């Protein structure tokens, strides 16, 4: 086994922008805007929920105080400073047009410009690189998703490089959202979607066959389906695995860290990566994720380098950025 070490350069490709909002940031905005959000916090000031459905309600309630592009500028600065503190050199965050101007293209442009400005400032100050992935919200339905897809297509470029879908996986089917994904694909955006977190292996198959994505958010349910694992490998699809989130929410294939399927997938040469999903909701960060992998599975620099290089390979960014990231990853983990 490699010696445990979690202080190298990290790459994160599954991070919900609003879901990364520190609770103190949301509480302050709520106070300033005179919005009562007391029910979504516990007596320590953290987010509170007892099920995935309640988590979604808490998440969306927190978003109600994120009302202006300036709010998102400050949120982005807070998120990226937190990322930097855990050794993250590159992150992709999911940005929902539904929470940024209610999927109005003109308003979305203003929100996205503020987020990009904050990302540029963070890059200048800390060296961290950020790219955005616009996302539709599954439980808001296919028609609303089309609006998000249009927002994404109209703003595709060097900063907004991908399109995806989050939300409640139990609602509808992946194929219901083909139109939104087709718009994004035609605009040159790279594609991912949440699948196989709650919806079983069939949800992953639908994502691959109906939406033609190159990455799967979570995807851990594939552990139940050897044929699907082989298809994922053959298609070179990357899984954006979020172990701490899965354990915190009680996903059936991950009742504990020791039973999480990431090691089995890694050992079968599936392209897995590690991210935090909605870190303050699940009391995690990328340092903790790596530390838990080290403590649970004995992973160290060699394994973490593979995880990080998998993320670089799957990142929705240009070749030159990937080259720089790969050099930093290898230097920090294996000193070559």
Regions found by a protein language model. Give the residues of each.
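Metal-cofactor-binding active-site regions of metalloenzymes
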Residues: 1-189, 198-203, 210-215, 221-238, ...
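Short HxH-centered metal-ligating active-site micro-motif
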Residues: 194
């Amino acid at each position: 086994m490699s010696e445990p070490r979690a202080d190298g350069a990290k790459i994160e490709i599954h991070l919900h922008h609003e879901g990364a909002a520190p609770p103190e940031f949301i509480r302050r905005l709520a106070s300033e805007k005179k919005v009562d959000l007391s029910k979504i916090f516990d007596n320590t000031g953290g987010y509170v929920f007892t099920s995935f459905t309640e988590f979604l309600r808490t998440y969306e309630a927190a978003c109600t105080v994120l009302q202006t592009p300036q709010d998102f500028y400050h949120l982005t600065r807070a998120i990226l400073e937190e990322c930097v503190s855990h050794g993250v050199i590159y992150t992709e965050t999911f940005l929902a047009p539904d929470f940024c101007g209610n999927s109005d293209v003109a308003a979305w442009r203003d929100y996205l410009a503020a987020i990009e400005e904050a990302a540029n400032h963070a890059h200048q100050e800390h060296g961290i690189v950020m790219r955005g992935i616009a996302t539709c919200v599954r439980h808001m339905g296919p028609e609303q998703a089309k609006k998000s897809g249009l927002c994404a297509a109209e703003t595709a470029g060097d900063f907004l490089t991908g399109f995806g879908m989050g939300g409640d996986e139990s609602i509808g089917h992946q194929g219901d959202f083909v139109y939104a994904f087709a718009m994004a694909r035609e605009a040159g955006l790279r594609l991912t979607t949440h699948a196989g977190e709650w919806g079983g292996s069939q949800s992953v198959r639908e994502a691959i066959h109906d939406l033609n994505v190159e990455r799967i958010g979570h995807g851990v349910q594939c552990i139940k389906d050897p044929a699907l694992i082989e298809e994922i490998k053959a298609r070179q699809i990357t899984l954006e695995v979020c172990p701490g989130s899965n354990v915190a929410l009680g996903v059936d294939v991950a009742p504990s860290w020791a039973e999480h399927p990431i090691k089995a997938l890694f050992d079968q040469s599936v392209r897995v990566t590690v991210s935090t999903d909605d870190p303050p909701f699940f009391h995690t960060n990328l340092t903790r994720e790596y530390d838990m992998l080290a403590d649970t599975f004995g992973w160290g620099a060699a394994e973490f380098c593979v995880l990080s290089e998998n993320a670089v390979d799957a990142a929705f960014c240009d070749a030159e950025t990937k080259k720089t990231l790969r050099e930093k990853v290898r230097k920090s983990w294996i000193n070559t």
